[in-house]
């Protein structure tokens, strides 16, 4: 369990520090071009889930739903993590990344009722939805679990 919380803690720290910097230095809805034609730092808020799912629902309902769902997912991960063999570092790291990312965004939902997003990848006029460190950790962790599943671990 120590490594689960250590890795998750690092992800939470990176996520929250990066968001603090965005909140401090980038006005809401602003953008700074980093790699022309590909990458901006932006300051946007997401009241929904990935791709703004449920963003139009009443704020109280959204907050209760997302906080409850996050706590349920983290509880399931902690339970599953305990069953992963100690030598399976790949899967254990994947669970830790998902946990850290989920808790990083949970902190935003509790504090603000929404999530701070700031990474904007795009090609031409097509922009992927803005995301953050927590989202990246959840995505990488989920992909790692998928690879583990496909490899039969």
What are these regions (language model features)?
Residues 1-153:
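Alpha-helical transmembrane bundles and membrane-interface segments of multipass inner-membrane proteins
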């Amino acid at each position: 369990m120590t490594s689960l919380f250590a890795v998750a803690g690092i992800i939470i720290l990176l996520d929250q520090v990066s968001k603090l910097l965005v909140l401090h230095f980038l006005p809401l809805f602003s953008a700074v071009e980093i790699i022309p034609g590909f990458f901006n730092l932006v300051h946007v808020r997401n009241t929904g889930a990935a791709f703004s799912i449920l963003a139009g629902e009443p704020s109280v309902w959204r907050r209760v739903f997302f906080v409850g769902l996050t706590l349920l997912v983290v509880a399931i991960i902690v339970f599953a993590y305990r069953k992963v063999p100690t030598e399976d570092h790949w899967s254990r790291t994947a669970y830790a990344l998902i946990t850290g990312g989920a808790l990083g965004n949970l902190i935003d939902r509790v504090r603000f009722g929404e999530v701070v997003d700031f990474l904007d990848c795009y090609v031409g006029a097509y922009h992927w939805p803005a995301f953050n460190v927590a989202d990246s950790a959840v995505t990488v962790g989920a992909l790692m679990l998928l690879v583990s599943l496909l490899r039969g671990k």
